[in-house]
C-alpha cells in the first residue's frame, strides 16, 4: 500500500485488478470521521436509518446528539428502564451500547452485569496496584 503523507490519501492496489481505489480523510468537526471512495471514485453509500430502532418509535434522529445517531436510539429510549425491541422487553446498556434482556441487568442499573463486572475488576486492580 502506497501512502502519501502530504496528501493524506492512501492508494490501494487490488490483486488481479487494474483499478485503484482511494481513501481520503475527511477532517471536519470529528477528527475520527473518514470517508471511503469506491474503486470507481464514487463515495460509498451506507444505510441511513433516520429514526430510533425501538419498535413504534418515530423519533427523528437527524437533530439528535452524535452518540444517539451512531447507536440509532433516541435519548428517551436510551434512558428508559424498559423498551420493546425485537418483540422482547429490553433495556439499552450504556457500556455495550446495545439492547439486552432485562434479566441481564441488576435492578434499575443501565449497564449489564457482564460489563459492570469487568469495570469493577479493573477498578479493583488499579486501586490494589496503588497501595
UniProtKB/Swiss-Prot annotation:
| List of residues binding Zn(2+) 2 | 93, 96, 100, 112
| Signal peptide start-end | none
List where in the cell it is found: Nucleus
**Main subcellular location:** nucleus
Pfam families per UniProt: SBP
The segments annotated as SBP-type zinc fingers are: 49-126
Give the motif span (Bipartite nuclear localization signal). 109-125
Q: Name one GO molecular function term.
A: DNA binding
The UniProt entry, under InterPro entries, shows: SBP-like, SBP_dom, SBP_fam, SBP_sf
Q: Where is this region: Disordered?
A: 1-52
Q: What does this protein do?
A: Probable transcriptional factor. Binds to the promoter of the SQUAMOSA gene.
* Name of the protein this chain belongs to: Squamosa promoter-binding protein 1
The gene coding this protein: SBP1
Amino acid at each position: 500500500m502506497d501512502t502519501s503523507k502530504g496528501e493524506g490519501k492512501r492508494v490501494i492496489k487490488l490483486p488481479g485488478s487494474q483499478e485503484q481505489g482511494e481513501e481520503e480523510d475527511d477532517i471536519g468537526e470529528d477528527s475520527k470521521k473518514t470517508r471511503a471512495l469506491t474503486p470507481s471514485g464514487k463515495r460509498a453509500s451506507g444505510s441511513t436509518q433516520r429514526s430510533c430502532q425501538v419498535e413504534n418509535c418515530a423519533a427523528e434522529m437527524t437533530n439528535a446528539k452524535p452518540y444517539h445517531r451512531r447507536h440509532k436510539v433516541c435519548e428517551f429510549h436510551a434512558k428508559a428502564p424498559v423498551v420493546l425491541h425485537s418483540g422482547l422487553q429490553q433495556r439499552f446498556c450504556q457500556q455495550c451500547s446495545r439492547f439486552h434482556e432485562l434479566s441481564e441487568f441488576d435492578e434499575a442499573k443501565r449497564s449489564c452485569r457482564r460489563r459492570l463486572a469487568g469495570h469493577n475488576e479493573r477498578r479493583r486492580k488499579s486501586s490494589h496496584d496503588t497501595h
